[in-house]
Amino acid sequence: MTSLKLLKEKAPLVICITNDVVKNFTANGLVALGASPAMSEFPADLEDLLKYAGGLLINIGTLTDENWKLYQAALKIAEKYNVPAVLDPVACGAGEYRKKVADDLINNYKLAAIRGNAGEIASLVGIDVASKGVDSAGVDNIDEIALAANEKFNIPIVVTGEVDAIAVNGEVVTIHNGSAMMPKVIGTGCLLGAVVASFIGLEKGQELKSLETAMLVYNIAGEIAEKHPNGHLPGTFKVEFINALYEITDEDVKEFKRVK
């Protein structure tokens, strides 16, 4: 069974501790894809929910001291129940405090994957890449960045940009699908982190397969959305992207995928 069919069959509960700007978009995107999102931020509630969860997303976009404690509490509970956790270290290359939080979560808690742009992941491994807030300039060595992070942390790594790279157990693949409209809509990267959390726990020992499917489904949905008559407009693209996540099939992935 393909990872996409497995996701739709299992409809995994995905706990999303994410930034305030993107909660609605993230929840709608996961529902469209076939997952079941919960946006809980109360540790006692998380203790109950994570018993049944298929994934946890920690997105540090809206960072506060209290949220840092929440991330730590959620990761402890997730490890207790063997729930795969995905970290999105938003803008960790833009300031010392964010880098400190990201380092803490990576070094002291169990993670199933890290998802970030080239600037974010490069900052975690000490590679110099131009980064401005949540955005990162296009880079040529995205596969090297992914491999360096994978080797340093021994965690599956997803690095996104004009080309995306996935590194698992020293193996790297690059994804050449996607839409130039994605950066025009706030939250597309954050939703991707939640999509990764939805796929990562579907098949134990098949992380590369699951992550590759997650990236292809997401990026090809973006291409489909952009092809809409008004897909070049951010408002239309946002709506059509959700529609494409709802309608995308394995046949679409097989036909349009560009993987190296």
UniProtKB/Swiss-Prot annotation:
Recorded protein name is Hydroxyethylthiazole kinase 1
Gene3D superfamilies listed in its UniProt record: 3.40.1190.20
Binding-site residues, ATP:
115, 160
Residue ranges spanning the membrane: these are: none
Q: Which domain of life is it from?
A: Bacteria
EC numbers listed for it are: 2.7.1.50
Q: Transferase: is it a keyword of this entry?
A: yes
Give the species: Streptococcus pneumoniae (strain Hungary19A-6)
Q: Which residues bind substrate?
A: 39, 187
| GO biological process terms held by the UniProt record | thiamine biosynthetic process; thiamine diphosphate biosynthetic process
Family in the record: Belongs to the Thz kinase family.
Pathway field = Cofactor biosynthesis; thiamine diphosphate biosynthesis; 4-methyl-5-(2-phosphoethyl)-thiazole from 5-(2-hydroxyethyl)-4-methylthiazole: step 1/1
